[in-house]
Amino acid sequence: MNRTQPLVLGIESSCDETGVGIVRGTALLSNTVSSSMEEHVRFGGVIPEIASRAHLDAFVPTLQEALADAGVQLDDVDAIAVTSGPGLAGALMVGVCAAKALAVATGKPLYAINHLVAHVGVGLLQEENTLPEHLGALLVSGGHTEILRIRSITDDVELLGSTIDDAAGEAYDKVARLLGLGYPGGPAIDKLARTGNAKAIRFPRGLTQPKYMGTADEPGPHRYDWSFSGLKTAVARCVEQFEARGDEVPVADIAAAFQEAVVDVITSKAVLACTENGITELLLGGGVAANSRLRQLTEQRCRAAGIRLTVPPLELCTDNGAMVAALGAQLVMAGIEPSGISFAPDSSMPVTTVSA
């Protein structure tokens, strides 16, 4: 096996995207994604059974397209990497079973990859091809909102803070439903918020009270954590009050004020975590990283704090196989032993476990 510039095939199936990506070392050769999002729209959210069946239908065509785009054959691959968690159990199982079948059929080593750490690994596919020292990662998606410290992407990832209830993306979807904006909620709210007044309504910022924050010397229990369930409830009560009075609901203003509350608390706590933990470089990733206001305010606050911000291209922020392949390549180059084929998908895989 080539351990200096390994050709790695990555498979992603943790939610509603079937992704296959191929990298050679830190060079991206192909990144093919098939999404089942349209099949979930009428339900207002991802239906696990539908997502799993969509992965079954999409995997072989997606694999074939990725190989063709990369100009390689399956036999050329040095190793296979697959998301084994966290995610939807049934969806993960489809990708893991497919990866195991390929590994057995080809005799290639198989690496079970942490989906969240893979979002950091995608930063290695950028121009510099190396992750800097003193690196942090802010991951914001439909299923996760976390701030990480990365000492080594292959074996030393520390969770500094996370949401204690809804993820930010999940809150977007639920509020969009309240406002009649449909699914997915993130893009709809982002677009509508541009026409609204974010200062028209003041929504709460969860876990920002002194009893939760504490101080740098004596941190509170949730200094770097987030909570969005109370914000979601506040939006619902706001809508109910307008409707009870018979007034028109100012949907654009509510969308803008909600988004500002989410982005404000995410960025303020992320920057706080960075400054108090010696983090000088921050990677922003996850599907919600496509949000224009989140990108804007993160950049502003990082610049003010002297933190260098990196945001991958949008197609690499959302779930994809290239990020899985990128992390797999790092494990190969670091001499980490393969996972074998006896591991099981882990829907609640902790971010501190880089590879199963």
Swiss-Prot record:
Its main location: cytoplasm. One of its GO terms (molecular function) is N(6)-L-threonylcarbamoyladenine synthase activity. GO terms for cellular component: cytoplasm. Its cofactor is Fe(2+). It is found in: Cytoplasm. This is tRNA N6-adenosine threonylcarbamoyltransferase. It comes from Arthrobacter sp. (strain FB24). The gene is tsaD. Keywords: Acyltransferase, Cytoplasm, Iron, Metal-binding, Transferase, tRNA processing. It catalyses: L-threonylcarbamoyladenylate + adenosine(37) in tRNA = N(6)-L-threonylcarbamoyladenosine(37) in tRNA + AMP + H(+). GO terms for biological process: tRNA threonylcarbamoyladenosine modification. InterPro entries: ATPase_NBD, Gcp-like_dom, KAE1/TsaD, TsaD. Its EC number is 2.3.1.234. Fe cation binds at H115, H119, D319. The keyword Metal-binding applies.
